[in-house]
Amino acid sequence: MTVLEETQEFGGISRTVKHNGNRMDIGGHRFFSKDDRIMDWWKTVLPLQGAPSYDDKKLGRDHDMEPGGPDPETEDKVMLKRHRVSRIFWNRHFFDYPISLSPNTLKAMGFKLTMVAGFSYLKSMFHKLPEDNLENFYINRFGRKLYSMFFEGYTEKLWGRHPSQISADWGAQRVKGLSIMGVLKNAFQKLLPKKRSNAEVETSLIEEFWYPKYGPGQLWETVESNCEAAGVKVLTDARVVEVRQTDGAVSSVVYEDSEGNRTELSGDQFISSMPVKDLVNAIDAAGADPEAVDSKPAPADMTEVANGLPYRDFVTVGLLVKHLKLKNTTSIPTLGNPPIVPDCWIYVQDPGYKVGRLQIFNNWSPYLVKDVDDTVWIGLEYFCEEGDSFWNMTDEEATKFAIQELTRMQVINGPQDVLDSHRERVKKAYPAYFDTYDRMPELVDYLDSFGNLYCVGRNGQHRYNNMDHSMATAIEAVKDIKSGETSKDNVWSVNTDKSYHEEK
């Protein structure tokens, strides 16, 4: 078995970047799944903590510890249990994420706006719109007023398109069962003494998650080490440039190393997580060679669909600051001097800012930050297009822009508080649901015609899956290979089951 990784690091957008003793989680990854196979596998790779972490001990926080589990203060291979706190920043106010009918929300909105939003939601309950786009999907679940406040501008910021131009499929996969009724149902069930299973909790409403001591990249670094110990050949800086076929099956791939050298690798079964666009264009890419008589490049209509699949690219700027101007006005204890806000994420849904989300790495894991008591390590997430003006900024320009936004938001006092910075750019971070996306079924049929080729993962299926769904596609692919199952419907159907979309 051979694994080819295009870059020098494993994990893709789930990797962890190390910078001057601090660590950045590129996309922010909660380890939580309704699929017990995934949860069990995670804790096999990194066992759950059996003793309190640094901040748990210092703040007196309680978690259910794993009997016999490792102590994160003395051992590195450990999965932490973390409390989830996320909020929305809109109109200079903080709201619960997801939106709830809490006293804080009602106070921040005011009586008049609350009444308008309430009647708007009631109208949406009795007058359902056809869910032929993402805008209608949101309005049906939250009403037009809340949609216009919290979803319309943020979605356009994320995708660069108005929600009316985006397929409702994205909402079905990412928002799933979330709605005002779902929020109320969850609030009521929390009052009951019975402990609920993961499958009974809407993913967007979870209150606790797991997280590797040193970020998600630690998990994939551990997996790489385990694979090599088991005899798997792992190659980095190995970009697949051609997929060769014979008689309707993939026979080999050609990969290129960092020095431009090309090597052909033959095999019996092939699992691809490379972007669909790149995969289709790589199929017999040397077919234009007149001597390559057996080659059969992808049909023109399939390359048309593949090349039309859109992506949203991503830039994250890390800022190490002395302290926050933003005060912790919650009842949740935190580290810091003064104590920092408790959020893992802050969703910036205010259209006056380009930043989409803030991460406060101190709250994900205290071990991500070199000096967790006296500095705050923040990540600003920006959505853009490769080659646009924001993408092409220098590190200095992007850092200056990020500092200005945090200062305007009154999160920090200004550039005088910034101690260090780092920028990361990620291509094809988010598969998008417009342009030729509606023709994906044609592409799936074509790719499935290669009996020994399995497409898995977010970009491998051009589906905005969570990490656990991406892993489940690989598990299903391996199951098919081992059993001899020829249909790949189970691989493509991960995260399309109605249990993820509908209220139970």
Task: Locate predicted features.
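Glycine-rich FAD pyrophosphate-binding loop
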Residues: 1-19
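General small-molecule cofactor/ligand-binding pocket signal
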Residues: 2, 233-235, 419-422, 454
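Dinucleotide-binding Rossmann-like beta1-alpha1 core, especially the glycine-rich loop
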Residues: 20-125
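Active-site/ligand-binding neighborhood in enzyme catalytic cores
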Residues: 102-105, 109, 113-246, 251, ...
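Mid-domain catalytic core of redox enzymes
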Residues: 212, 238-397, 401-410, 489-499
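A short coil-to-beta-strand element that immediately follows conserved catalytic motifs
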Residues: 314, 413-425, 488-489
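C-terminal lid/capping helical subdomain adjacent to the catalytic/cofactor pocket in oxidative enzymes
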Residues: 423-424, 433-504
